Amino acid sequence: MTDDQILAEFRAADALLQGHFLLSSGRHSEYYLQCARVLMDTERAGRLAAALAAKLPRELKQAIDLVVSPAMGGVIIGHEMGRALGKPAIFVERPTGTFELRRGFTIDPGAKVLMVEDVVTTGLSSREAMEAVRAAGGEVVAEAALVDRSAGSNIDLGVPFYPLVAINFPTYAADELPPELAGTEAIKPGSRSVAA
């Protein structure tokens, strides 16, 4: 799947939004990719997961024991990646601010885990979710995501990173907003509390 085909999937789902958005990282953007909208169509979600799975090296796919994703945003694509790879898929969640396994999910000691996210911007949620996996005895061997939104900042997740598409929409600190954003109220569309 080419980058243009991937973005066409987002456009077809009305998931490429334009406005003034406050991202979970605390930065502002004129554009937002609402992955929940692109993933609500099960056939589209399956196509995107299959394309993402195809980006992984064969040796890595063979080594993976389990797919883990952080709730909320990663749950659907994590499940679809599990399906595409023929591996079980679970998720971590943060009921009190720290990711943890719940709902009876367990990770076998030493299990090779693929972390799967919808969007990675700073990598903070990914690193926090990886800590929960390690605390439960798993070994995170790589991360995959639908969208790398890091704008070429070379985020360090500590493991190989395989995004389906890299999008470099400009982001701004609150005190660096361009005039077209400064005059409008920001909408916070994500599921995580905004970083301080």
From Swiss-Prot:
Keywords: Glycosyltransferase, Magnesium, Pyrimidine biosynthesis, Transferase. GO terms for biological process: 'de novo' UMP biosynthetic process; pyrimidine nucleobase biosynthetic process. This is Orotate phosphoribosyltransferase. Its cofactor is Mg(2+). It comes from Sphingopyxis alaskensis (strain DSM 13593 / LMG 18877 / RB2256) (Sphingomonas alaskensis). The keyword Glycosyltransferase applies. Belongs to the purine/pyrimidine phosphoribosyltransferase family. PyrE subfamily. It catalyses: orotidine 5'-phosphate + diphosphate = orotate + 5-phospho-alpha-D-ribose 1-diphosphate. It is an enzyme of class 2 (transferase). It holds the Pfam family Pribosyltran. PROSITE patterns: PUR_PYR_PR_TRANSFER (PS00103). 5-phospho-alpha-D-ribose 1-diphosphate binds at residues 117-125.
